[in-house]
């Protein structure tokens, strides 16, 4: 049966770093307050001239180079983002133009912080159903600093900018089947519940004429995040007849170290098997998981043949997970 696997990863972070002490000069907070409650020490901020598509393209080039493929071989491009360059066209088609990728079809996915999970799931389904797609480029890219209220200390300390990308390959185009037969996306699950008020923007194009700024009910988000991330992982294990001890690594959405620790405790998982970049990247929304995945593979904390789970939750609420063998 045709399936997909992650061939390569890439990432891009803007040059500017914004530390907690610098934020403390903007709002009433402190490095200690931010660290204790979130685990975040810094975040990256895009230059005024940078667009989300620029971040996406830079991460894509990194992944394409590692995959050692031509852009002409890419048949599908999906960009997961909440902060596109324009209302239309999609960020994916803009990135496609900048990459000079002529043979793909492209579109955006908007599922907030769960966007990359949604995008990988869609790409996997399209690869399985379309033998003509040899390679898919899946990107999570965000400039969250543009929709943050920098006067709201409860949210402005949480977010950062960045992009991560993966090249997914179809096994229908593999000559090296003995090498890649065990690699691949094994299962995915996606959910949403329409609980829109706990995490949203105060405004939008059709309601206020602008993108709006982020609003969050922190306590409610924490409770939902811990319960839903845990349940998604448990469902993945149940559906695949696995135990938590079978999992070699976990890449959770990098929102808050306290959420990650609470999920790990409920699962009775080992914290040393968890990929954690929230301290350096902060919450980069849809870019969070591909950034962390690329970091872990480069270290290498994720090694070929290992079994792992990607899991995220975002506004909507939306959540889900991907089980894969790298």
From Swiss-Prot:
SS bond list: none
Enzymatic reactions: malonyl-[ACP] + acetyl-CoA + H(+) = 3-oxobutanoyl-[ACP] + CO2 + CoA
InterPro entries: ACP_syn_III_C, ACP_syn_III_N, FabH, Thiolase-like
A GO term from the CC aspect: cytoplasm
Keywords on record: Acyltransferase, Cytoplasm, Fatty acid biosynthesis, Fatty acid metabolism, Lipid biosynthesis, Lipid metabolism, Multifunctional enzyme, Transferase
GO biological process: fatty acid biosynthetic process; secondary metabolite biosynthetic process
Residues of the active site: 113, 253, 283
EC assignment: 2.3.1.180
Span list, region ACP-binding: 254-258
Chain's role: Catalyzes the condensation reaction of fatty acid synthesis by the addition to an acyl acceptor of two carbons from malonyl-ACP. Catalyzes the first condensation reaction which initiates fatty acid synthesis and may therefore play a role in governing the total rate of fatty acid production. Possesses both acetoacetyl-ACP synthase and acetyl transacylase activities. Its substrate specificity determines the biosynthesis of branched-chain and/or straight-chain of fatty acids.
Subunit architecture: Homodimer.
Protein name: Beta-ketoacyl-[acyl-carrier-protein] synthase III
Organism annotation: Wolbachia sp. subsp. Brugia malayi (strain TRS)
Lineage: Bacteria, Pseudomonadati, Pseudomonadota, Alphaproteobacteria, Rickettsiales
